[in-house]
């Protein structure tokens, strides 16, 4: 219910690669709800959350992109200074080791969303709910 499928796309560090990838998705009417790009010397990892991840994966793989599906959890927080830190404090106090996180647009201007990934998503979900942190239902992502 709360696990959101993220696509990780491996991109060669080459001029125009990011544009070409995002243009391909746009040309196939695929909207991007969240995006993160991490790079190394030779390649980057583009992480995306889209409403129709199966279609996006199919489109990308048809053009020989390497695409991996990974579940993430979306947490909702107040859009104020310290919003992210308050969630990270809970995770730190509960000994949850995050692998990565990035932002997602959520709830207009008063709320913000944070996509989180860790080795044990069930534990992450349980801890967040125990501390009354609202989670982003996957249906909101997929039905938009």
Can you name each region flagged by the protein language model?
Residues 1-144:
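A conserved regulatory-domain signal marking ACT and ACT-like small-molecule sensing domains
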